[in-house]
Amino acid sequence: MSRNTEELQGISLLGNQKTRYPTGYAPEILEAFDNKHPDNDYFVKFVCPEFTSLCPMTGQPDFATIYIRYIPHIKMVESKSLKLYLFSFRNHGDFHEDCVNIIMKDLIALMDPKYIEVFGEFTPRGGIAIHPFANYGKAGTEFETLARKRLFEHDSQ
């Protein structure tokens, strides 16, 4: 079940050898494609070990591994656009908790997933590691209940 040219319209970054890397926060770079299996509930997981942002107070770099897991509905995020989007945080000054919530909200706006969670495993600074977790389940569905359950159990994994 290969994808045809029409299904790939709007995917402009994958395979593009002249990729330009954004110098500032760039949610508009995110691209989506149709989920061919919207009737199946399944997780898609991204592990992004090279995330960098800036401390809004000191301007010093913060490093993290960002974990994104979602259950797609109609749309899915294209991975190269996600890579470039995450790269766009490199010169963006925000707290760890803000970065995780911004990433989640931007992906919700792009895909409208059934469920999504974003976890940031930030490298310790000043002897303290910060690991923010944000999630969302589509209102009025079983995924709203899943989100609540996962929120309270996320740290037991």
UniProtKB/Swiss-Prot annotation:
Active site: 55 (thioimide intermediate), 62 (proton donor)
GO biological process, one term: tRNA modification
Keyword Ion transport attached: no
Name of the top EC class for this enzyme: oxidoreductase
Domain of life: Bacteria
Compartment(s) where it occurs, according to its Swiss-Prot or TrEMBL record: Cytoplasm
EC number: 1.7.1.13
Gene Ontology molecular function: preQ1 synthase activity
Annotated Gene Ontology cellular component terms: cytoplasm
Keywords of this entry: Cytoplasm, NADP, Oxidoreductase, Queuosine biosynthesis
Reactions performed catalytically: 7-aminomethyl-7-carbaguanine + 2 NADP(+) = 7-cyano-7-deazaguanine + 2 NADPH + 3 H(+)
SUPFAM superfamilies: Tetrahydrobiopterin biosynthesis enzymes-like (SSF55620)
Gene3D superfamilies assigned to the protein according to its UniProt record, in alphabetical order: 3.30.1130.10
Pathway stated in the Swiss-Prot or TrEMBL entry: tRNA modification; tRNA-queuosine biosynthesis
A family per Pfam: QueF
Cytoplasm recorded as keyword: yes
Residues binding substrate: 77-79, 96-97
Chief localization: cytoplasm
Main function: Catalyzes the NADPH-dependent reduction of 7-cyano-7-deazaguanine (preQ0) to 7-aminomethyl-7-deazaguanine (preQ1).
Classification via PANTHER family: NADPH-DEPENDENT 7-CYANO-7-DEAZAGUANINE REDUCTASE
Family in the record: Belongs to the GTP cyclohydrolase I family. QueF type 1 subfamily.
Protein name, per record: NADPH-dependent 7-cyano-7-deazaguanine reductase
Organism: Neisseria meningitidis serogroup C / serotype 2a (strain ATCC 700532 / DSM 15464 / FAM18)
